[in-house]
Amino acid sequence: KKIIFLKKYTSGQATTVSKALKFLKNDQIVIVHSCDLNFKINFREIKKKLKKYDIVVITANGKEFNYKNSNQFSWVRKNSKSKEVEISLKKNFITNKRKNRVLVGSFIFKNNEILNKSIKYIMRNKLKVKNEYYLDHAVSISKKIGFKLGEIIVKKYRSWGSHSELKNFK
């Protein structure tokens, strides 16, 4: 375990994570988790998903706060034809808004190499959203660069990332 101190602000979650990549082994599983939320997850399910997918996004059913502030979140759904995971960055999909899931900001990568390639792709191509490099974006392009994307829907998801969520947190 290692704590890395950054000397200046970064341009987003993906940029921050990229600072730690050199400390990780290429073949080890990498879990990136936002600090302003929690949920329960079954680790056996993670192992099972990583046998099938290179990257797994953690999602939850949206709450009223998410729907009212949908542009603060990325959204996930399964394509009705291909059954592949699709991500809409910082806005909900136009159709079936209440059936789409909110991307909670936690990600699992089969290994460091996959994470590194995903981040490098968005940075090399200057793919920013709201002037930041988001991991949401790095995983949304996973198919384009040859990776399989899966999803785990968690229950008991709690977030305190916004002022109103923190104020109402119990």
Sequence positions of predicted segments:
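Catalytic-core segments of class I nucleotidyltransferases/pyrophosphorylases
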Residues: K47-K48, S80-W160, S164-K167
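Conserved beta-loop-beta/alpha segment of the NTase-like Rossmann-fold superfamily
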Residues: K1-K78, N111
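Catalytic core of nucleotide-sugar-dependent glycosyltransferases
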Residues: K170
